[in-house]
Amino acid sequence: MTTPDIALPRRHVLDSTMAYREAGLVGAPIALFLHGNPTSSYIWRNIIPPVARVAHCVAPDLIGFGQSGKPPIEYRFQDHARYLDAFIDSIGMTSAYVVAQDWGTALAFDLAARRPGFVRGLAFMEFIRPMADWSEFHQVPAARDTFQKFRTPGVGEQMILEGNVFVERVLPGSIKRRLTDEEMAAYRAPFPTPESRVPIWRLPNELPIAGEPADVWTRLEAAHRALAASEYPKVLFVGNPGALVSPELG
């Protein structure tokens, strides 16, 4: 199993590269791990080892995150889907059991809708979905206020690009225990400059709330309809307290 301080293998993907962690049994069913914002495949470091006893685990760093490249793109949801597709194709993956959290869930739902038969099973938590209004976004009112600021022109850029608030405050604030210095260093490493934090800033602006952004809303509505109609096995992990997902959903 690769440790966070060792350079991960990379694949040439479109006009850039994507890094990934890989462990487990060659020839076994694939477990594809998809992280969210502002993390990387590092978030799965304690989950992959036990799963690797029965599966071939692959955990990419999404484009712009972790040790993956940062090409000059907008880092919209559609960009992440495009690069993830290319990564999957580059390693010849034809099906997988998917484990996803945060924006990784949106990518998983979208992937399953566009590639029938690819997803053999889905384990997910804190999932992204079309939300009618801000009251559906988060269980904590202060968090809703913060994310509304992230979407306010000029304010969000100052908070995330200049202040690195997402890494320094939102991430550690969403975890019950205190992150170690080593863990925080791993999460900070991909984002040393304001320019490098554009991928972090973009994703709060992609959240499908009250019909906006329209293209993301439409795409994820279709993905959720496909999810509801699908027959592959699924398991939803619900925390107490939850963040994006309330304990009542469990």
Region locations from a protein language model:
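Flexible "cap/lid" subdomain of the alpha/beta-hydrolase fold that forms the substrate-access gate
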Residues: 2-24, 30, 58, 65-99, ...
